[in-house]
Curated annotation (Swiss-Prot):
<comment type="pathway">
    <text>Amino-acid biosynthesis; L-arginine biosynthesis [regulation].</text>
</comment>
<dbReference type="InterPro" id="IPR001669">
    <property type="entry name" value="Arg_repress"/>
</dbReference>
<keyword id="KW-0678">Repressor</keyword>
<dbReference type="GO" id="GO:0003700">
    <property type="term" value="F:DNA-binding transcription factor activity"/>
</dbReference>
<comment type="function">
    <text>Regulates arginine biosynthesis genes.</text>
</comment>
<keyword id="KW-0805">Transcription regulation</keyword>
<dbReference type="InterPro" id="IPR036390">
    <property type="entry name" value="WH_DNA-bd_sf"/>
</dbReference>
<keyword id="KW-0963">Cytoplasm</keyword>
<dbReference type="GO" id="GO:0051259">
    <property type="term" value="P:protein complex oligomerization"/>
</dbReference>
<dbReference type="Pfam" id="PF02863">
    <property type="entry name" value="Arg_repressor_C"/>
</dbReference>
<dbReference type="Pfam" id="PF01316">
    <property type="entry name" value="Arg_repressor"/>
</dbReference>
<keyword id="KW-0028">Amino-acid biosynthesis</keyword>
<dbReference type="GO" id="GO:0003677">
    <property type="term" value="F:DNA binding"/>
</dbReference>
<protein>
    <recommendedName>
        <fullName>Arginine repressor</fullName>
    </recommendedName>
</protein>
<keyword id="KW-0238">DNA-binding</keyword>
<dbReference type="InterPro" id="IPR036251">
    <property type="entry name" value="Arg_repress_C_sf"/>
</dbReference>
<dbReference type="GO" id="GO:0005737">
    <property type="term" value="C:cytoplasm"/>
</dbReference>
Length: 150
């Protein structure tokens, strides 16, 4: 019953703006689940739901995984809008950006926590990325190109 309820909760928060535990409990009751606010509270904790402000200024429950995907999309957009070229030179990856954008692009790359990176250095329009091996440098170039090309 718990897994069915959890599935229903995910379905509800994806389709309806739920701002409070009471609203979620009400929606679950409409769907035929007999729940208390304490049960809903535990479910929210177990499902790792978080509240996020929507574009209308209201806070609603969302799934952390969706938050991660949204962050990756934002960081990919930064790269897509700033990077002009990417190449690997031995264990280094050289990323060229539009003027003044290297720091923002490097921060996006660092925030993505790409495991193959040992470190980044950003200038005004160039980023040097030290990678742990030649193979991983080639992989990183492919990953960055994939992000900027969509």
């Amino acid at each position: 019953m718990k897994s069915k309820r959890h599935s229903k909760i995910i379905e509800i928060i994806k389709s309806t703006a739920i701002e409070t535990q009471e609203e979620l409990a009400e929606e679950l009751k409409k769907a035929g689940f007999d729940v208390t606010q304490a049960t809903v509270s535990r479910d929210i904790k177990n499902l790792k739901l978080v509240k996020k402000q929507d574009n209308k200024g209201h806070y609603r429950y969302t799934i952390i995984e969706e938050e991660k995907n949204e962050m990756v999309d934002r960081l990919s957009n930064i790269l897509a809008n700033t990077v002009t070229s990417v190449e690997n030179v031995d264990k280094m990856v050289v990323v060229k950006t539009i003027s003044g954008s290297a720091s923002a692009a490097a921060e996006a790359i660092d925030t993505l926590h790409l495991g193959e990176i040992a470190g980044t250095i950003a200038g005004g329009n160039t980023i040097f990325i030290l990678v742990r091996s030649l193979e991983k440098a080639e992989t990183l170039v492919s990953r960055i190109l994939e992000m900027i090309e969509g």
